[in-house]
Amino acid sequence: MAKKMIMPVAWAQDVDCWLETLKAAGFSDDTVRSRRYKIARLCRELPSPMETTGEQITRVFAAHDWKPETRKGYRNTIAGFYRWFYETGRRGDNPTAKVPKVKKPQAHPHPCPDKYILMALGKATEDERRMIRLAAECGLRRSEIAAVNSDDVMDDLLGKSLIVRGKGDKQRIVPCPDDLAAEIQACGGYLFPGRWSGHVEASYVGKHITRLLPDGWSAHSLRHRYATRTYESTHDLYLVSKLLGHSSVETTQIYVAMPDSRLRAGMSAVTLQA
């Protein structure tokens, strides 16, 4: 997140304890920061954790014009907090139990066309070019791109691969173009080092990539492009799922667009002939 949301005093101690349990469970730093941001934003419109009711939470959600995925993220966050709050005996009920569940949106693949990616590469800096290639040619998430390190490059039987540390600290190995792998190895540490220490944040990567693409396209659409191209070449959805770091093939289906060549073939088959 660009700014750290200030936590109301009435919530601070309990939220800190809850976040500690997430860290203890192995959630990534990015996930913990995201949960903190969301709970801080919500509780600024609510009384204390003990006084908050389900109706009040529902009114907060009704007052915001959030996209479905954003709304779902906020609901999951406050539901997770109150589930912990109830299970640890801090309160005798869970006020989120009657908060309406968010309807799961019908997601569709959104692969960025290669022509836009090539245009972006043409005006990108060296660092931005590497960010774009890691998303479009290796299928990495923003947070994964931010954390790429020279130590992550390894030799496989056919060339170079990249060890990727994904959500929940799960690791996977993805093929990496030799020239890109050489650039990563040459950096001698984080490919995108932070200003003071560590590496840049996911939001930094996302902003740089989105700035170079036309409106409506983002770093995530490059990941969709990777999934679509890989499936078109292999016809192996399970393989694509593993390369993307998904725990479910069902999730991968959202990323894979039907190849245009097959759609055109279908159109040709039904076109009326004079």
State the predicted function of each range.
Residues M1-M7, V270-A274:
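C-terminal secondary-structure termini that scaffold catalytic or DNA-interacting sites
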Residues A2-K3, D16-H108:
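N-terminal core-binding DNA-recognition domain of tyrosine recombinases/integrases
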Residues M5, G168, L244, V249-A269:
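Catalytic-site neighborhood detector that most strongly recognizes the C-terminal catalytic loop/helix
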Residues R91, K103-M119, G168-D179, L191:
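DNA breakage-rejoining catalytic core of tyrosine-based enzymes
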Residues R91, Q106, C112-R142, A146, ...:
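Basic, Lys/Arg- and aromatic-enriched nucleic-acid-binding interface segment
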Residues R133, E137, R225-S247, I254:
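C-terminal catalytic core of tyrosine-transesterase DNA break-rejoin enzymes
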Residues A147-I184:
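Conserved tyrosine-mediated DNA breakage-rejoining catalytic core shared by Y-recombinases
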Residues P177-G216, H220:
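Active-site/catalytic core of tyrosine-dependent DNA strand-transfer enzymes
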